From Swiss-Prot:
Biological processes per GO annotation: translation
Protein family (similarity comment): Belongs to the universal ribosomal protein uL10 family.
Name the UniProt record assigns to this protein: Large ribosomal subunit protein uL10
Coiled coil: none
Summary of subunit composition and partner proteins: Part of the ribosomal stalk of the 50S ribosomal subunit. The N-terminus interacts with L11 and the large rRNA to form the base of the stalk. The C-terminus forms an elongated spine to which L12 dimers bind in a sequential fashion forming a multimeric L10(L12)X complex.
GO molecular function: large ribosomal subunit rRNA binding
Matches recorded under InterPro entries: Ribosomal_uL10 (IPR001790), Ribosomal_uL10-like_sf (IPR043141), Ribosomal_uL10_bac (IPR022973), Ribosomal_uL10_bac_type (IPR047865)
Pfam families listed in its UniProt record: Ribosomal_L10
Length: 165
């Protein structure tokens, strides 16, 4: 059923609001994907707080006008699904991971930090660890010297007790 003018304006406003908060936008061609697979992709996107939507390209172009994602408008051709996220890598990671298991989802382009990326750029962005993973690695690196020192003190205390006994 075609959208009337008010519905189109509402869609553009909704997508523009998402784009205004976003750090990353990823475009992927979804030709030939089964409905069940698309539902799975949407569920994974929801878990990662990624706004994922199939849009008419003209409406998407209007939504990105005047934003840092405006250069992506040139890439908006064909049947596309749009992944939009506030997290810098979440949209790229969700779409890239799904495209590995389903060859019918083809990453077309993306934009991060005002720069348009091709498929390789989106895949490179997706390979970056998440903020939580980076924080846990940093914490481990910071704890390693302290825990090593604590183990050395414990070993020294055991040695002293063994000598005293």
């Amino acid at each position: 059923m075609p959208l009337n003018r008010e519905d189109k304006q509402a869609v553009v406003a909704e997508v523009a609001a998402q784009v205004a908060k976003a750090q990353t936008v990823v475009l992927a061609e979804y030709r030939g994907i089964a409905v069940g697979d698309l539902t799975t992709l949407r569920a994974k996107a929801r878990e990662q707080k990624v706004y994922l939507r199939v849009l008419k390209n003209t409406l998407a172009r209007r939504a990105v006008e005047g934003t840092p994602f405006a250069p992506l408008a040139e890439q908006m051709t064909g049947p596309l699904i749009y992944g939009i996220s506030e997290d810098a890598i979440a949209a790229a990671k969700v779409v890239n991971d799904f495209s590995k298991s389903n060859d019918k989802l083809v990453i077309k382009a993306g934009s991060f930090d005002g720069k348009v990326m091709d498929k390789a750029g989106v895949q490179a962005l997706a390979s970056i660890p998440s903020r939580e993973e980076l924080l846990s690695k940093l914490l481990f690196v910071m704890q390693a010297p302290v825990s090593g020192f604590a183990r050395a003190l414990a070993a020294l205390a055991e040695k002293k007790q063994a000598e005293a006994a």
